Amino acid sequence: MASIKEKIAYALGDAAAGGIVWKVMSIAFPLFFTNVFGLSFADAAVLMLVARMFDVVTDPIMGSLADRTQSRWGTYRPWLIFGSIPFGLIFALLLYTPDLGPVGKRIYAYSLYLLMMAVYTMVNVPYGSLLGVMTDDDNEKNQFSAFRMIGAYAMGFATLLSFPYLQKWIGGTNAHQYAVTGAILGVVAAIMTMVCGLLTKERLKPVRAEKFSFHQFANLFHNKAWLYMTAMAICTNFFNGFRYAVAGYMFDYCLHGSVTVDDLIINFTVFMAFGEVTCMVFGGVAPWFAKKVGSKRMAFFWSAVFCLVTSVAFFFIPMDSAYIGLMIALVILTSMGIGIYSPLLWSMYADVADYHTKHFGTSATGLIFSSGTMSQKFGTAISGSLIALLLGWAGANMITDAMGNTSIDPASVTNSVLIMVWSLFSLFPAAIALLLMLLAYKFPIKK
């Protein structure tokens, strides 16, 4: 039986990866790259698409490599221990705006973003795989997953809530604020990742892992449960990706900037932080809810139903800051559903890994969890790319100043652009939630 101390240590891993690094990449990077760093919509969209093609190769290789690692620290833990420092350092560098021309900035952004994705894979794939070797008890897997999600959402809440206040405290230009904030958060992420690697335990020895081959990866397509799980993971990250990536544009253009309510500065990061704390609370409810409705897949199904209803309702709120309270209320309600299905997702991946070992006779834990990480990055990045492309399609144009920096032309933000932004936060996620319902209902593992 694992101790509370170990479960908290495990939670720190996703507090760093999900609550800091991925949260900032999801919600702040689209706006940062176009409005601060100076990339065009097209450059930002292509950057994320290129990174996804890169991940298609690196993620499964990393999963197989992690499965075959043998060291004094175990199979998966050394990747967290020794990957923690480059993880935090590269994240910090990615939020720095160098004094370069347009071409130099493109090279810097593309190089650092791809490197960040590689290091994220190097740390997060073994982290996810840890769940398969820390315990073989299904209920305890759910508990570890719940701790993981609580850690991620608690840190996500702290990150998003503190973001505008950190920037205000740092002062200076937007570029300087992002750079210093990135350095602070990078240090915190590195420390959390290292502590996670040092204080967790691998109690189970993985079943023999085959040397990686693309044939081995192709064999996953014979695993029906893995196919459903991959589709569900992509959809959950599409759902979250649309909402997080467009939130900054929604505040800038639909609500005309930050909203102040009783001295509380509500910008796009604080707005989404209300959802983070809700997810944190309901992440702890997920194991109980799964028992209540009879299975993980049905808990997933009903949480997707809730997300569908609340997302559609958000579309009908007027684009007026006077309704900020109602907007926050619906973000909280939507996050109740997200908070329930998020920990179940990773617990279900552990079930898929067990299913694969039972039916195929070899361990593919790292490979299967790497596909989960790849799905996470694929869904988030493609949604970010689509947002950039759809805003351009709706009529938003970029202008270039005398220094070669690009930004959105305010004159191009027409009513069609505003409706597109509003829909990307509400109707697009609603359609994804509908697909999630169907996939969860048909998921073949019933426990």
Q: Residues of each region from the PLM?
A:
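Membrane-embedded alpha-helical bundles of multi-pass transporters/translocases
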Residues: 1-447
